[in-house]
Amino acid sequence: MTDRFLASINAALTDSDPAIAGLIDQERQRQETHLELIASENFTSQAVMQAQGSVLTNKYAEGLPHKRYYGGCEHVDAIEELAIERAQRLFGAAWANVQPHSGAQANFAVFLALLQPGDTIMGMDLSHGGHLTHGSPVNVSGKWFKVVHYGVERDSQQLDMEAVRQLALKERPQLIICGYSAYPRTIDFAAFRSIADEVGAYLLADMAHIAGLVAAGVHPSPIAHCDVVTTTTHKTLRGPRGGLILCRDADFGRKFDKAVFPGSQGGPLEHVIAAKAVALGEALQPEFQVYSCQVVANAQVLAGRIQERGIAVVSGGTDNHLVLLDLRSIGMTGKVADLLVSEVNITANKNTVPFDPESPFVTSGLRLGTAALTTRGFDDEAFREVADVIADRLLKPQDESIKAQCLERVRQLCGRFPLYRDVLQPALA
């Protein structure tokens, strides 16, 4: 009996579940053979995947390091402490909680710690580049709180901080949120701090999309200006899928510990926390700063070339990893554009643009991001070609010869920049 159980837990995935093993391999092949331009995605290191796929998966560890409700936590305590220390060092924070399962969970913990149901929160309108957790009516943030939204200025498609200030003075929110999912310009955290102080509001920065750029110093940091900062650990930070909360004030930060556990989560995912620690360690290396600079340079090349080809870009360019195409300029919807590029092995996503006449299910925009392909080694020249492939496909959607050429160019680009040279999946071997 004992031998039988040991045999089952030591079996390779290909033997124990060939269906799942096969699907994982198909997904690996898809990632290798497609151009990944979804702005919220990236390719994490094999070291991160090894940590996440380790025996730490087996360990329950409710509570904080050295304050657990379970025994046998001495090693996960050390791992979590490393993750906390690295997060603090990377972002210049006095306090960090590495337990949130996602960015949404991190935001919810902040709401739980700082607000009461019925309080007023102020964040960017989702259709202008905000996020579901910043007060969308379909999210708990939009159900529990009174929500007021600010947006970009119609002509520049950028934030007008005086308009944000006037709205805050009128509505007097308890919490102001800055940080977005589809805003390609630099965020003026100091200006938001001034507005929050003027109306007596807490200031939350959700830097999920730009955390890697902040860590590398290529985007201003919110830490010194905001009461609390949340982020995901993937996207531009290039770690596992998860969340993180940071504070400049350790005493203030500790109130979020209880909001995470037991307020909104049970046991932390220590295998994911280990992977976060690995990714944070990677981001502390000089190479990561070089990578992040290239992410922004590539986005600017992509935006510039797309515009040269006659397709409008929201706000006229980008300061970060995001490029948002305004397809009204060529009489196309985001839904159609998403399908067209997917047919030539480019993954992106349809997205609303400011003052979009289309529904969120159709949209007038296509959101692109450069973080993942930069990880593969794509440089300025390669991204110029990526821009041309996208433009060729969108500008001549009915031309089958152009479609075939685009497919071949994508195949060649993927071949020039292989992803995982030594495939990490020992269980699949």
UniProtKB/Swiss-Prot annotation:
Domain of life: Bacteria
Subcellular location: Cytoplasm
PROSITE patterns documented for this protein: SHMT
Gene Ontology biological process terms, A to Z: glycine biosynthetic process from serine; tetrahydrofolate interconversion
Substrates-to-products reaction catalysed: (6R)-5,10-methylene-5,6,7,8-tetrahydrofolate + glycine + H2O = (6S)-5,6,7,8-tetrahydrofolate + L-serine
Modified residues (N6-(pyridoxal phosphate)lysine): 235
Annotated metabolic or biological route of this protein: One-carbon metabolism; tetrahydrofolate interconversion; Amino-acid biosynthesis; glycine biosynthesis; glycine from L-serine: step 1/1
Binding site for (6S)-5,6,7,8-tetrahydrofolate: 126, 130-132, 359-361
Keyword Cell division appears in the UniProt entry: no
Entry cofactors: pyridoxal 5'-phosphate
Annotated keywords: Amino-acid biosynthesis, Cytoplasm, One-carbon metabolism, Pyridoxal phosphate, Transferase
Disulfide linkage: none
Any Pfam family matching the protein: SHMT
Protein task: Catalyzes the reversible interconversion of serine and glycine with tetrahydrofolate (THF) serving as the one-carbon carrier. This reaction serves as the major source of one-carbon groups required for the biosynthesis of purines, thymidylate, methionine, and other important biomolecules. Also exhibits THF-independent aldolase activity toward beta-hydroxyamino acids, producing glycine and aldehydes, via a retro-aldol mechanism.
Record-given protein name: Serine hydroxymethyltransferase
Organism this protein belongs to: Prochlorococcus marinus (strain MIT 9313)
Gene that encodes the chain: glyA
